[in-house]
Amino acid sequence: MLYSLARPMLFSLAPERAHELTLSMLDKAHKLGIMRQTVEAKPTTCMGIEFPNPVGLAAGLDKNGAHIDALAGLGFGFIEIGTITPHPQSGNPKPRLFRIPEAKAIINRMGFNNDGVDKLIENVKASKFRGILGINIGKNADTPVEKAVDDYLICLEKVYNYASYITVNISSPNTKNLRSLQSGDALTELLQALKARQLELAEQYNHYVPLVLKVAPDLTAEDVEFISAQLLDFKIDGLIVTNTTLSREGVENLPYGNESGGLSGAPVFEKSTECLRLFAQTLKGQISLIGVGGILSGEQAAAKQQAGATLVQIYSGLIYTGPTLVKQCVEAMT
């Protein structure tokens, strides 16, 4: 109700300013104790972790982990922060975020703008949140793709003790050549290095933190087969399906519809759900799947579950539907 009143004002602002203002308002409401949404418990086990409910916040909303406590008050079963990189970076030039309300869509070309992994860890330490926290890691824009493994290893080592699970983001379309890591020897070398280090860290800290890969929806059936085989070979714990799409289907004739970047929101739902279904058919339950992409209703969350997801994540849907979407999704899922 409150969000439906605030939305016209927020939508009158530039998208990035509205994003900042929303998080600021959420923080203030949390401190005053007036922003707390009660969501039914629906315990769900995934990757050896018991989640209080299967609906999480996707990475990208809270890149630096600066708003964890306020976001936790919305009733999420888990929160994923990031994408974080070894060093701070400003991302791509503005404007870089575009709303397409006619299609309930967003295009972003943010470019992993973040304050660096050390700042994120400071924020996590300062948080009172003791729930399930995913940390999404990436590479700096000025790191050559041939050296990308080094950036992921730095982040893995630094966040290991602060994360419930760690997501390896190789699917953002907004960092040059990043998606090339989804194929061939590049993927093999990355997963091999990360898995070896994960096992060393698990032994060192006597605590196993699951490793999750996040992929794009713009994959062929052959890509799905190859990625699935690699995930199984290296015993990766989970897969997030999917990131944003490069397709412009459904928005090509709308204002901002042909801006460069990744498209999210309603138009990506079918594409990402089909990709999820393909991975589910290929992996046959051997790896946990997390469905994300275009969820704007409880029914769509349930559809992701039917396509093979154990958990779901939302982000763009929150912008168009508001925080009640969390509750709707939890209620619709089994």
From Swiss-Prot:
GO molecular function: dihydroorotate dehydrogenase (quinone) activity
Pathway info: Pyrimidine metabolism; UMP biosynthesis via de novo pathway; orotate from (S)-dihydroorotate (quinone route): step 1/1
Gene3D superfamilies found in the cross-reference section: Aldolase class I (3.20.20.70)
Positions bound to FMN: A59, G60, L61, D62, K63, T83, N136, N169, K214, T242, G265, G294, Y315, S316
Record keywords, A-Z: Cell membrane, Flavoprotein, FMN, Membrane, Oxidoreductase, Pyrimidine biosynthesis
Its membrane topology: Peripheral membrane protein
Biological processes per GO annotation: 'de novo' pyrimidine nucleobase biosynthetic process; 'de novo' UMP biosynthetic process
Catalytic residues identified in the record: S172 (nucleophile)
UniProt subcellular location: Cell membrane
First-listed, main subcellular location of the protein, grouped into a coarse class: membrane
Coiled coil: none
Catalysed reaction, written as an equation: (S)-dihydroorotate + a quinone = orotate + a quinol
CDD domains assigned to the protein according to its UniProt record, in alphabetical order: DHOD_2_like
Pfam families: DHO_dh
Entry GO terms, CC: cytoplasm; plasma membrane
Subunit structure, interactors included: Monomer.
PANTHER family: DIHYDROOROTATE DEHYDROGENASE (QUINONE), MITOCHONDRIAL (PTHR48109:SF4), DIHYDROOROTATE DEHYDROGENASE (QUINONE), MITOCHONDRIAL-RELATED (PTHR48109)
Known role: Catalyzes the conversion of dihydroorotate to orotate with quinone as electron acceptor.
Protein known as: Dihydroorotate dehydrogenase (quinone)
Native source organism of the sequence: Acinetobacter baumannii (strain SDF)
Gene name for this UniProt entry: pyrD
